[in-house]
Amino acid sequence: MERKAILAAFWRAVAAQERDPLRGFFAEGAEVLWPNTNERFSVEEYLRANCEYPGKWNGKIERMLDTVEASVTVTRVWSEEFSVRAISFFRWQGEKILRLEEYWSDDGAPPEWRRKMQIGQKITEDGNGVKDILERDLAGEPVSIDENIIAVGSPAGDIKPVPKE
């Protein structure tokens, strides 16, 4: 299976909180790191944290880079109660995830101290996506997890649009 398809299927299983399909994406002895909270998980612990998270949520891969050794996804995850982004670094053993390092951050307004500085500009009007950036950078549209990934990197690391089929 092509790596972009593996990652799309992985994020579908994450959003659906499907424990058994998720388990199948990981190599034996794989580990998951969440540096923001200083946590290291075994696959079973990661499955528990993900699959027992309360509520239903959605996900959209906004960007993906792929090299021979590793992949990176930027994924928006949201529900009616929250919106976050996960920057995920995947190390592979064949077609299985050997190491997943994720950085999760809340979407929201800049902190008051920075608003007072009156610097910066909005990336998007609704604040929920990086559509404007992707259109400028890749001349593409963000994709839902159920669609094709719009960009992958070549082994040299450059970004190329992938046409929707």
Model-derived regions, located:
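C-terminal and inter-domain tail/linker signature
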Residues: 1-121
